[in-house]
Design a protein with these regions (language model features):
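Extracytoplasmic metal-acquisition and chelation regions
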Residues: 1-170
Length: 170
């Protein structure tokens, strides 16, 4: 859910309410911090929308290592046509027929970029790149923050990497 700032805002409000419940003497501090963060998250929705809007609609197709961008796809209009590992668990294996299926999707849809997540590099991606000539983009962080990174920085870094590599793929 972390690729949809509105869902993160909802979680923030829930956490705030529980903190107020458990520590009412500091309620005003929790409420002020929660309100400020939710406001920041609402602004983040606009930033992400604006960035993605710079990608021509025909270039918004992508392939990833595993199913991690569903909320980004649903909220902001990207189209994840296939994943190398068809689950959220990057430890899962892929069958040869599934690998061929991903290659077929790439070729049938003229997909130009495959995003390889930093936390779970895939040997399967190397095979796909070799077979299709698709551009491999490494370093997409989808599951964890880098040391010292905030959630808004995490989201914007991921979106900027995606936008940079999809914007001019014709």
């Amino acid at each position: 859910f972390w690729f949809d700032p509105n869902r993160v805002a909802y979680a923030t409000e829930y956490i705030e309410s529980k903190l107020v419940e458990f520590d009412p003497s500091n309620a005003s501090e929790y409420e002020a911090a929660g309100k400020a963060y939710v406001t920041e998250l609402k602004g983040l929705v606009g930033q992400v929308s604006e960035l993605i809007s710079t990608i021509p609609s025909q270039n918004r197709k992508l392939i990833t290592t595993h199913e991690s961008l569903g909320y980004l796809e649903a909220k902001f209009g990207l189209e994840v046509l296939s994943t190398i590992i068809p689950s959220l668990d990057s430890a899962n294996e892929i069958s040869p027929s599934q690998l061929v299926g991903v290659i077929d999707v790439i070729e049938d849809n003229n997909v130009k970029v495959i995003f390889i997540e930093a936390e779970a590099p895939s040997v399967y991606a190397e095979t796909i790149v070799a077979e299709t000539g698709i551009k491999a983009v490494e370093g997409l962080w989808v599951e964890t923050l880098k040391e010292g990174q905030s959630y808004p920085e995490f989201l914007l870094d991921a979106v900027e990497l995606i936008v940079e590599n999809l914007r001019n793929t014709d």
